């Protein structure tokens, strides 16, 4: 049977893609950021995933405001990139695994998630930048992918609770797949940032560091945030943390943090990176399934609310 070998959360800032295209990995401004990924490359060499489930948010390349599904899953044999207008070069297509994707889709629907199925799917920088960061060498790009797009732009957005539960359903789907493959779950986006309005340039370091700690040790508490709480504390585009919730939900309750970094100077987005490994595998992770995680949306009104006034 398939198993989840780990999860990675990483930012997907478009300027990273431009830096990669221009070979700036050793530029003094960029080097501290790119050096943070070297331990991840070593870890990936060690665990050798057979497939990557990539949870990201589309920015208007495949979906737009007139048609924006809450959750969409790719079921194609390949996923093409296209010009988004950011000045990023178009990259070569990524391989898919339709058989796995259809199993994932059918399992999620049986788990009462209404999924938009995409037999053709363009993937934007939120997908391609993380893949380029994690597998920078062309020969490493053979890992098949299953993209999952989460709505983070068109009201109403899915709640952190819903995204965390989606992750749990993805974990169940993976571990019910009959092939013996090692699956990596990647959540892209974040951390805190706001690109427009009165708070343009907003970064909340204290909240970001709280997220990096709680996503490991207490994801259920973090998932109690409402979307409005996330916008308040992480900025309008900081809601991309929803993809981190999906990734964490696909992991077991107990995880081991293998690596994390936090870096701000490359852009007006706080860049986060985290690698997690499951402490348990297989059926052990679902022993508590009968006591399904149930939390409601609520506005956080405790000392944590003070972090909304802290900026880097």
Which residues make up each language-model segment?
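Flexible, D/E/H-enriched segments
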Residues: 1-50, 62-165, 176, 198-296, ...
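Beta-strand elements within well-structured catalytic alpha/beta cores of enzymes
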Residues: 50-56, 148, 181-189
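Glycine-rich beta-alpha junction loops
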Residues: 12, 189-190
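Catalytic metal-binding/acid-base residues of hydrolase active sites
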Residues: 58-60, 191-192
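Non-transmembrane, aqueous-exposed alpha-helical and coiled segments at domain scale
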Residues: 153, 168-183
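Intrinsically disordered, low-complexity proline-rich regions
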Residues: 296, 303-305
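Divalent-metal (often Zn2+) His-rich catalytic cores of metallo-beta-lactamase-fold enzymes
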Residues: 189, 195-199
């Amino acid at each position: 049977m398939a198993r989840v070998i780990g999860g990675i959360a990483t930012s997907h800032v478009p300027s990273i893609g431009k830096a990669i295209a221009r070979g700036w990995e050793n530029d003094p401004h960029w080097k501290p950021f790119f050096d943070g990924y070297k331990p991840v490359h070593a870890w990936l060499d060690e665990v050798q995933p057979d497939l990557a489930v990539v949870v990201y948010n589309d920015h208007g390349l495949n979906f737009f405001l007139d048609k924006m599904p809450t959750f969409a899953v790719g079921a194609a044999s390949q996923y093409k990139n296209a010009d988004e207008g950011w000045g990023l070069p178009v990259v070569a297509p990524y391989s898919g695994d339709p058989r796995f994707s259809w199993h994932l889709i059918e399992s999620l629907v049986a788990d009462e998630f209404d999924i938009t199925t995409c037999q053709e799917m363009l993937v934007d920088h939120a997908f391609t930048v993380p893949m380029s960061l994690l597998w920078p060498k062309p020969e490493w790009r053979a890992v098949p992918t299953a993209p999952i797009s989460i709505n983070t732009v068109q009201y109403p957005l899915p709640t952190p609770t819903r995204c965390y539960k989606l992750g749990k359903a993805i974990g169940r789907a993976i571990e019910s797949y009959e092939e013996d493959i090692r699956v990596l779950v990647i959540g892209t986006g974040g951390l805190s940032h706001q690109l427009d309005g009165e708070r343009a340039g907003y970064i909340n370091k204290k909240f970001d560091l709280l997220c990096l700690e709680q996503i490991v040790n207490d994801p259920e508490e973090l998932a109690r945030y409402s979307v409005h709480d996330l916008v308040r504390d992480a900025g309008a585009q900081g809601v991309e943390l929803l993809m981190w919730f999906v990734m964490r939900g696909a992991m077991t309750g107990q995880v081991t943090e293998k690596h994390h970094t936090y870096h701000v100077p490359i852009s007006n987005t706080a860049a986060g990176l985290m690698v997690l490994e499951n402490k348990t595998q297989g059926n052990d992770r679902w022993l508590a399934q009968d006591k399904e995680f149930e939390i409601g949306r609520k506005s956080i009104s405790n000392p944590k609310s003070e972090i909304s006034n802290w900026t880097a």
